[in-house]
Swiss-Prot record:
Classification via PROSITE patterns: RIBOSOMAL_L15
Disordered: annotated segments: 1-44, 150-175
Primary role: Binds to the 23S rRNA.
Organism: Sphingopyxis alaskensis (strain DSM 13593 / LMG 18877 / RB2256) (Sphingomonas alaskensis)
Family: Belongs to the universal ribosomal protein uL15 family.
Comp. bias regions, Basic and acidic residues: 1-13
Name by which UniProt lists this protein: Large ribosomal subunit protein uL15
HAMAP family for this protein: Ribosomal_uL15
Single GO biological process annotation from the record: translation
Record keywords, A-Z: Ribonucleoprotein, Ribosomal protein, RNA-binding, rRNA-binding
InterPro entries in UniProt: Ribosomal_uL15 (IPR030878), Ribosomal_uL15/eL18 (IPR021131), Ribosomal_uL15/eL18_sf (IPR036227), Ribosomal_uL15_bac-type (IPR005749), Ribosomal_uL15_CS (IPR001196)
Positions with biased composition (Gly residues): 23-37
GO molecular function, one term: structural constituent of ribosome
């Protein structure tokens, strides 16, 4: 048996006909149209999201979890294996320093308002210099093993902010 495009159709019973409600008592769905008697749910346009008729709603029965860390960093994650693929495909230049802008242009670093974090998944064979916001120990070791280097931003020493300055000024004033 050959199948022709102009003879394709659904199996019998695959599409059930729509029930037309409110069309007389003989239809079985007349008068109240399956909505029961009076009340809020018998009226039109009423559907209260999350309301379960006085029963404690599901979204309130389940415990709250987690929090939003206001100090959390948003890094774009890039693996060494992906960088090597891009170098092999000539989408990245191994001789130039690879930074957030270069990785974004290559289509790897999406988002990451705090920069790029380099991870060690995959293998890197090219000698590359990275200028990134963060890198795992394994990634740094893998890059250095391949003959490259990872330039990370200088970390500020503890107590180098406004509060420490004010404390130092107050101590000098009292002395």
């Amino acid at each position: 048996m050959t199948i022709k495009l102009n003879e394709l159709r659904d199996n019998n019973g695959a599409r059930k006909g729509r029930m037309r409600v409110g069309r007389g008592i003989g239809s079985g769905k007349g008068k109240t149209a399956g909505r029961g008697q009076k009340g809020q749910k018998a009226r039109s346009g009423v559907a209260i999201n999350g309301f379960e008729g006085g029963q404690m709603p599901l979204h309130m029965r389940i415990p709250k979890r987690g929090f939003n860390n206001i100090f959390g960093k948003d890094f774009a994650i890039v693996n060494l294996g992906m960088v090597q693929k891009l170098i092999d495909a000539k989408k990245l230049d191994a001789k130039a320093t690879i930074d957030h802008a270069a990785l974004k242009a290559a289509g790897v670093a999406r988002g990451g308002k705090d920069g790029v974090r380099l991870l060690a998944k995959g293998e890197l064979t090219a000698k590359v210099t990275f200028a990134v916001a963060g890198a795992s120990k394994g990634a740094i070791e893998a890059v250095e093993k391949a003959g490259g280097k990872v330039e990370l931003p200088e970390a500020r020493p503890e107590g180098d902010g406004k509060k420490a300055t004010r404390k130092a000024e107050a101590a000098a004033k009292n002395a």
